């Protein structure tokens, strides 16, 4: 039967998870990309660490071995839109976790299909409203390739496009209301003072 497979953890926690600056940066990233938990962010950091480790390992190889293995890594990264076709290993080392998160299906759907927030796009993906080509994809963290990016669209039975158009048309236009003119009211004339004071007896 063979040895059983033990799944390896695909994410690692930061060394100082309670650091204030790190926590604020993580919360900002969670809001920007609509992540549900920090675990999704840690997965991106772990994957980035793996890719950068491969790049550093290639830099340490002999030139002939590096020339054989480097195109394999660069082609795989260019396929998912992380680097350009003429990028170098230095470009790989300059990648950030935000670069990986920007290739998620949730992020691309937010920008491409006109959602206001990434959380709206996440709900649409999870409930099967998004298709890539002829197949539905309900995984928000799915990594979209460059070839697939132009084939992302709503499912034919989805009513979300009509809802988005309706919300756009019902958005109240900003009207400039002129302030009412102030009415000038003349002050009443002062009562005439007594012509002569009372005479002393």
UniProtKB/Swiss-Prot annotation:
CDD domains documented for this protein: S4
Biased composition (Basic and acidic residues): 189-201
Record flagged with keyword Lyase: no
Chain spans, region Disordered: 163-201
GO molecular function (one): rRNA binding
Annotated SMART domains: Ribosomal_S4, S4
Keywords: Ribonucleoprotein, Ribosomal protein, RNA-binding, rRNA-binding
Keyword flag Ribonucleoprotein: yes
Bias-annotated ranges (Acidic residues): 172-185
Gene Ontology CC annotation, any one: small ribosomal subunit
A Pfam family annotated for this UniProt entry: Ribosomal_S4
Entry-linked Gene3D superfamilies: RNA-binding S4 domain (3.10.290.10)
Function: One of the primary rRNA binding proteins, it binds directly to 16S rRNA where it nucleates assembly of the body of the 30S subunit.
Similarity comment: family membership: Belongs to the universal ribosomal protein uS4 family.
Self-association state and partner proteins as the record states: Part of the 30S ribosomal subunit. Contacts protein S5. The interaction surface between S4 and S5 is involved in control of translational fidelity.
PANTHER family reported for this sequence: 30S 40S RIBOSOMAL PROTEIN, 40S RIBOSOMAL PROTEIN S9
Protein known as: Small ribosomal subunit protein uS4
Organism annotation: Nitrosopumilus maritimus (strain SCM1)
Gene designation per UniProt: rps4
């Amino acid at each position: 039967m063979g040895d059983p497979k033990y799944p390896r953890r695909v994410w690692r926690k930061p060394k100082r998870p309670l650091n204030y600056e790190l926590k604020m940066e993580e919360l900002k990233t969670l809001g920007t990309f609509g992540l549900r938990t920090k675990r999704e962010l840690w997965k991106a950091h772990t994957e980035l660490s793996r890719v950068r480790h491969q790049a550093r390992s290639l830099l340490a190889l002999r030139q002939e071995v590096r020339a054989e293995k480097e195109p394999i890594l660069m082609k795989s990264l260019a396929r998912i839109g992380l680097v350009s076709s003429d990028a170098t290993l230095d470009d790989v080392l300059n990648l950030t976790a935000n670069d990986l998160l920007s290739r998620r299906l949730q992020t691309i759907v937010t920008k491409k299909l006109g959602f206001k927030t990434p959380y709206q796009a996440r709900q649409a993906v999870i409930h099967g409203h998004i298709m890539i080509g002829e197949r539905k994809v309900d995984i928000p963290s799915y990594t979209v390739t460059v070839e697939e990016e132009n084939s992302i669209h709503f499912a034919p039975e989805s009513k979300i496009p009509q809802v988005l158009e309706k919300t756009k048309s019902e958005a109240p236009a900003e009207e400039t209301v002129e302030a009412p003119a102030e009415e000038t009211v003349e002050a009443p004339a002062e009562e005439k003072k007594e012509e002569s004071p009372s005479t002393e007896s």
